[in-house]
C-alpha cells in the first residue's frame, strides 16, 4: 500500500528518469537551428573540435547536447531520417549505461548512433554488438554513412576476416560485429605472443543490440577455443549399441522439467552385464560411466529436428530460441560425440579447452555497457543483479493500437493446428498478412503441411540464411502474405505493411556490377566502363524502386483497411519475453495489427510446467474433444507457469555465473600476468581496468612495461620459489628441524647452485643467502647477453604460463563435472568448487614460477646471437601451437544438468595453499600478497 501511494505521489523510477530526459531533449532541440545552418564540410571540423575539448579535460556529459544535435542533423542529411524526441531519450539512457526498451519499429538502430558518436569522441572506441553477421554488416554500412559524414571511421568484424583486417576494424572509431566474434577475438588475443598482434583495443563501451537475446538467452553458452585430444572414439560406439535396449521407467527415469535422466538399479545391472563391467561406479570405470550418462542423455533428452539436425553427415545444433542452425558449435563433455554415435555419423574427437569465457563475464569487462531491445522489462531483475544494468522503458513515438486477443486452448495438438489453419485461411481471404510463430523447425513444417492441404500459399522461414531471412521477413506485411517462422527468426528487420519497396527492387534487379580485378597485359585498370555500368544500374534501381513504392503504398492502404499484420503464436514459449517479441512484430509505429496464441494441452509448457492448476481449470470449465476454451483465468494460469519457468531458468543462469566467476577471476589474473610479460620491451602502452568488487566502478590505468620491470618480475619469481623451498625444508625460524641435505638438493635441482649453509642462523638469513647467489648468476647472464637473453626468457615465461594454464583448465573441467556429488556428503558443491579451484590456481601459479626459474638457471646460451636464435625458435614453436588450436567454437550448453553423472574429480589439495609473496592477495585488493595480508602475517 505504501509503495503504491509513493508511486502515485512521486511516480515510478522510470517516470522520474523520463521527466529528467525530457528536459535534456529540450536543450538538444534548441541547438537544431544552429546545426541546420552548418555546411556539409563543417561537420568534420565540429567533430575535431569536440575531440580536442575532450583531450583538454571536458567530459562527455558536457558535450552530450551538441553531439546529439549534430548527429541528428547528419542523419537527416545523409540517410533522410531525423531522430524523434523519444529516440533522443533512448540515446541518453544508453549513454548512461542502461538498457533502453524500445518497441519493435521504433528505430533502435538509428537511436544507437547518438551515444555511439558521443562516446567515440573519446578516441577509445565503441563496439556495437548484434546477433548475426548480416545485421552487423547492414548496420555498419547503413549507419557508417552518417559516421563518415561526421568524420568518424567505421569497421565491421566478420567471421571471414583475417587478423590484419580485424585489427583495422577494431582501430576504427566505431566497430560493429556479432557477439561471438568479439568474445572469440578476446580469447584469441590472449593466446598471442606479441602485443602488436592483438586485434582488440581496450574494452571501452559496448552497445548490445537485442541485449536480452545475447545476455540472457545465450548466457548459458560459454565461448570455448579448443584443441583436439588423442582419445579413441570406440567407447561411444560400444555404449551406443546397448542404450536403445533400455526400457523407460523400468531402466531409467526421465525428468523433462529439469532436463535430467538417471539410471535405476535395474538399468545399472542390465548395462553392467551388456558392457561386461563389474561395477559401473567403481573408480576405475568412471570414464565408462561418463560415456553411459552422455549416451543416455543423447537418446532421451535430445531430439532430431528439434535440438539438432543431421546435415552433410554432421550433427548441427539448432538454436532453441531462434531455430537457426549453428554449424561449428558442438556440445561439450562428450555429448556431441554421443549424439553422433546415435545418428550413425562420423564421430569427431573430443576437444580439450585452451581458452574459455562466458558472455556474462566477457561483457562485464567493458568499462561501460548498454543495451537495446523491444522486450527487457520482464528480465529487469536479472539485468540489475548480474550486469548492474537498469532497464528504462521508452515511450512509443505514436500510441500503439495493436489488439492482443485472449489465448485459445484445445485438448490436442492436431485440433490446435486445424484451428490455426482455419484462422489463417479466413485472414488470407480478407487480404490480411499473417506471421505464424513456432517454437521449432519441426513445428514450422507441421503448420506448413496443414496450410498446404488447404491450398494456402505461404513462406516457411527455417532460418538457414540471414540475408534471405531478412528479405522474406521484410515482405511479411504484403497483402495476403502468410509467413511461418521460428519465434525470433528475422529479428532486426522491420515488417512494413504493404511491403518494402527497396528490398523488392533489389530482388528484381540483382546485385550491382562487380568491379574489374585485373587489366589485360598488365595495363592499368580502366574503370570508365565499370563506372558507366554502375551509374546505369543505380538509375535503373531508382526507377524500379519508385514504381514499386507506388505499388506498396496502394497495398499499404489495403492492408491497413484489412486490420494490419496479424500474429499467430502456435505455442507459448518458456519465457514471456519471447512471446512479447513475437507479438511486437505487429503494430509498429502506430500501425494496426493483432495477435493471438493457439495452445493445446499437449504443448511442452502445458504438459511439463502447467501444473495441476491448469488441468483443474480445464476440468471445471468442462473441456470436451474438439472444444476450445478461452478464459482470462486460463491466460493468468499460463502466465503463472511461465513465471515459474523464468525463475527456474534465472536460477540456472545465476548458478552458472557463480561457478564461472571462480574461473573468471583466475582467467583475468593469468591474462593480466601474460600481458605484463608480453608488454616488456614492446613499447606498446598496457591499458588495464580494475573493478571495485563492491561498487563495480572501473578505474582505467595505462603504462609502458620496460625490460627493467620484467627483470623485477623474474627476481620476484625467484624470491617466491626460494620461500617455497625454505617453507618445505626449513619450516622453523631457527636451524632446529631444518633438513639441510634435502634443502641443498632442492637448491641444486631448481637453481643449479652448489651451496653451503654453514653460519646461517635463521630462516630470513637462509632465504637472503640463496637469493643473492641466484641473483648474481642471473645478473651476470643478463649483462653478458643483454636484450636477446631477456627476449628468450620472455618467450620461456609465456610458454610455461600457457602450458600450465591449459592443464589447469582441464583440471577445473574435471572438478566441475564431479563437484555436484559433494552434495551427497552434506557439503555445498559451490563452496567446495571455489575452495578447491582457488587451491589449484595458487598451486599452478607456484608451478609456473618454479618451472620458469628452473629453466632460467639451467640454460647457458653460448652467445648473444644464440640466445636470439633460441628466442626466435621458441616464438615460432608457440605460434605453430596456437595455429593448431581449433578455430573458436562455442559449446551449446554450459549449465550443469541436475542428473549429470560425474567424471573423476581432482583430489583435494592441502587445506590452505601457499600463496606466493608476489602473487595477488586472496582478499581481492589487487595488491601483492607481501604488501597486503602477507605483511601482517609476517609481523606475527
UniProtKB/Swiss-Prot annotation:
Assembly notes: Monomer and homodimer. Part of the essential Sec protein translocation apparatus which comprises SecA, SecYEG and auxiliary proteins SecDF-YajC and YidC.
Cofactor: Zn(2+)
Catalytic activity line of the entry: ATP + H2O + cellular proteinSide 1 = ADP + phosphate + cellular proteinSide 2
GO biological process, one term: protein import
Organism field: Myxococcus xanthus (strain DK1622)
Keywords in alphabetical order: ATP-binding, Cell inner membrane, Cell membrane, Cytoplasm, Membrane, Metal-binding, Nucleotide-binding, Protein transport, Translocase, Translocation, Transport, Zinc
Cofactor note: May bind 1 zinc ion per subunit.
Keyword Transport in record: yes
Signal peptide (residue range): none
EC number(s) reported in the record: 7.4.2.8
Membrane topology term: Peripheral membrane protein
Enzyme class: translocase
Recorded GO CC terms: cell envelope Sec protein transport complex; cytosol; plasma membrane
Binding-site positions, ATP: 87, 105-109, 494
Cell compartments where the protein resides: Cell inner membrane; Cytoplasm
Region spans: Disordered: 879-940
Name used for this protein in its record: Protein translocase subunit SecA
Gene Ontology MF annotations: ATP binding; metal ion binding; protein-exporting ATPase activity
Family the UniProt entry places it in: Belongs to the SecA family.
Biased composition range(s): Basic and acidic residues: 884-898
Biased composition range(s): Low complexity: 900-915
Amino acid at each position: 500500500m505504501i509503495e503504491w501511494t509513493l508511486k502515485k505521489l512521486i511516480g515510478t523510477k522510470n517516470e522520474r528518469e523520463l521527466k529528467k530526459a525530457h528536459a535534456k531533449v529540450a536543450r538538444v532541440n534548441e541547438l537544431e537551428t544552429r546545426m541546420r545552418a552548418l555546411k556539409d564540410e563543417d561537420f568534420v571540423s565540429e567533430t575535431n573540435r569536440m575531440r580536442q575539448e575532450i583531450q583538454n579535460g571536458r567530459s562527455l556529459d558536457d558535450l552530450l547536447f551538441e553531439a546529439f544535435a549534430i548527429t541528428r542533423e547528419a542523419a537527416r542529411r545523409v540517410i533522410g531520417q531525423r531522430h524523434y524526441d523519444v529516440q533522443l531519450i533512448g540515446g541518453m539512457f544508453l549513454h548512461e549505461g542502461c538498457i533502453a526498451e524500445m518497441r519493435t519499429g521504433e528505430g533502435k538502430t538509428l537511436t544507437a548512433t547518438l551515444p555511439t558518436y558521443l562516446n567515440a569522441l573519446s578516441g577509445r572506441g565503441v563496439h556495437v554488438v548484434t546477433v548475426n553477421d548480416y545485421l552487423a554488416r547492414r548496420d555498419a554500412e547503413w549507419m557508417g554513412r552518417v559516421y563518415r559524414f561526421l568524420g568518424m571511421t567505421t569497421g565491421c568484424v566478420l567471421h571471414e576476416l583475417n587478423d590484419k583486417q580485424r585489427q583495422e576494424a577494431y582501430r576504427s572509431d566505431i566497430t560493429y560485429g556479432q557477439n561471438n566474434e568479439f568474445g572469440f577475438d578476446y580469447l584469441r588475443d590472449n593466446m598471442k605472443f606479441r602485443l602488436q598482434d592483438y586485434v582488440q583495443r581496450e574494452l571501452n563501451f559496448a552497445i548490445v543490440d537485442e541485449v536480452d537475446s545475447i545476455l540472457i538467452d545465450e548466457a548459458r553458452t560459454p565461448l570455448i577455443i579448443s584443441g583436439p585430444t588423442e582419445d579413441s572414439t570406440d567407447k561411444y560406439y560400444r555404449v551406443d549399441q546397448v542404450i536403445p535396449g533400455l526400457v523407460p521407467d523400468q531402466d531409467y527415469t526421465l525428468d523433462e522439467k529439469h532436463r535430467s535422466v538417471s539410471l535405476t538399479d535395474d538399468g545399472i545391472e542390465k548395462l553392467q552385464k551388456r558392457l561386461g563391467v563389474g561395477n559401473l561406479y567403481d573408480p576405475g570405470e568412471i570414464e565408462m560411466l561418463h560415456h553411459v550418462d552422455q549416451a543416455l542423455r543423447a537418446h532421451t533428452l535430445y531430439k532430431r529436428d528439434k535440438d539438432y539436425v543431421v546435415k552433410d553427415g554432421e550433427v548441427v545444433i539448432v538454436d532453441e530460441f531462434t531455430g537457426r542452425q549453428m554449424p561449428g558449435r558442438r556440445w561439450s563433455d562428450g555429448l556431441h560425440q554421443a549424439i553422433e554415435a546415435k545418428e550413425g555419423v562420423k564421430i569427431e574427437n573430443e576437444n580439450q579447452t585452451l581458452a574459455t569465457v562466458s558472455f556474462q563475464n566477457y561483457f562485464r569487462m567493458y568499462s561501460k555497457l548498454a543495451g537495446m531491445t523491444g522486450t527487457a522489462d520482464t528480465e529487469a531483475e536479472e539485468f540489475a543483479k548480474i550486469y548492474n544494468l537498469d532497464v528504462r522503458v521508452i515511450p512509443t513515438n505514436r500510441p500503439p493500437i495493436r489488439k492482443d486477443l485472449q489465448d485459445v486452448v484445445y485438448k490436442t495438438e492436431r485440433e490446435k493446428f486445424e484451428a490455426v489453419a482455419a484462422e489463417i485461411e479466413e485472414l488470407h481471404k480478407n487480404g490480411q498478412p499473417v506471421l505464424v510463430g513456432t517454437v521449432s523447425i519441426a513445428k514450422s513444417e507441421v503448420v506448413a503441411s496443414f496450410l498446404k492441404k488447404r491450398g494456402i500459399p505461404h513462406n516457411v522461414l527455417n532460418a538457414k540464411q540471414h540475408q534471405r531471412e531478412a528479405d522474406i521477413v521484410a515482405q511479411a506485411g504484403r497483402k495476403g502474405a502468410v509467413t511461418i517462422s521460428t519465434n525470433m527468426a528475422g529479428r532486426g528487420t522491420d515488417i512494413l505493411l504493404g511491403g518494402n519497396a527497396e528490398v523488392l527492387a533489389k530482388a528484381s534487379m540483382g546485385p550491382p556490377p562487380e568491379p574489374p580485378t585485373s587489366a589485360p597485359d598488365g595495363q592499368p585498370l580502366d574503370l570508365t566502363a565499370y563506372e558507366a555500368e554502375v551509374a546505369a544500374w543505380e538509375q535503373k534501381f531508382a526507377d524500379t524502386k519508385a514504381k514499386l513504392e507506388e505499388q506498396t503504398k496502394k497495398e499499404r492502404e489495403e492492408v491497413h483497411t484489412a486490420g494490419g499484420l496479424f500474429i499467430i503464436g502456435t505455442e507459448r514459449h518458456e519465457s514471456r519475453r519471447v512471446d512479447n517479441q513475437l507479438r511486437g512484430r505487429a503494430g509498429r509505429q502506430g500501425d494496426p495489427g493483432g495477435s493471438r496464441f493457439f495452445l493445446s494441452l499437449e504443448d511442452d509448457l502445458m504438459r511439463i510446467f502447467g501444473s495441476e492448476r491448469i488441468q483443474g481449470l480445464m476440468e471445471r470449465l468442462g473441456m470436451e474433444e474438439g472444444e476450445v476454451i478461452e478464459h482470462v483465468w486460463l491466460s493468468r494460469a499460463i502466465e503463472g507457469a511461465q513465471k515459474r519457468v523464468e525463475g527456474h531458468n534465472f536460477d540456472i543462469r545465476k548458478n552458472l555465473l557463480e561457478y564461472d566467476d571462480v574461473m573468471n577471476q583466475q582467467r583475468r589474473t593469468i591474462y593480466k600476468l601474460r600481458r605484463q610479460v608480453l608488454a616488456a620491451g614492446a613499447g606498446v602502452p598496457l591499458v588495464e581496468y580494475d573493478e571495485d568488487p563492491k561498487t563495480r566502478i572501473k578505474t582505467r590505468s595505462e603504462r609502458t612495461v620496460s625490460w627493467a620491470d620484467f627483470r623485477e618480475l623474474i627476481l620476484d619469481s625467484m624470491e617466491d620459489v626460494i620461500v617455497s623451498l625454505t617453507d618445505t625444508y626449513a619450516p622453523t625460524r631457527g636451524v632446529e628441524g631444518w633438513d639441510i641435505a634435502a634443502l641443498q638438493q632442492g637448491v641444486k635441482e631448481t637453481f643449479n647452485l652448489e651451496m653451503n649453509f654453514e653460519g646461517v642462523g635463521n630462516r630470513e638469513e637462509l632465504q637472503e643467502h640463496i637469493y643473492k647467489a641466484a641473483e648474481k648468476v642471473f645478473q651476470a647472464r643478463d649483462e653478458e647477453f643483454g636484450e636477446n637473453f631477456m627476449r628468450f626468457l620472455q618467450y620461456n615465461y609465456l610458454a610455461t604460463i600457457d602450458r600450465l594454464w591449459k592443464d589447469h583448465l582441464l583440471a577445473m573441467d574435471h572438478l566441475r563435472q564431479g563437484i555436484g556429488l559433494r552434495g551427497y556428503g552434506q557439503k555445498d558443491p559451490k563452496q567446495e568448487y571455489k575452495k578447491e579451484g582457488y587451491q589449484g590456481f595458487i598451486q599452478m601459479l607456484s608451478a609456473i614460477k618454479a618451472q620458469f626459474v628452473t629453466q632460467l638457471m639451467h640454460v647457458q646460451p653460448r652467445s648473444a646471437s644464440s640466445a636470439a636464435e633460441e628466442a626466435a625458435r621458441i616464438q615460432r614453436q608457440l605460434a605453430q601451437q596456437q595455429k593448431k588450436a581449433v578455430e573458436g567454437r562455442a559449446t551449446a550448453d554450459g549449465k550443469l544438468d541436475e542428473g549429470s553423472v560425474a567424471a573423476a574429480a581432482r583430489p583435494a589439495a592441502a587445506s590452505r595453499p601457499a600463496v606466493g609473496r608476489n602473487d595477488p592477495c586472496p582478499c581481492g585488493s589487487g595488491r601483492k600478497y607481501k604488501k597486503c595480508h602477507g605483511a601482517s602475517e609476517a609481523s606475527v
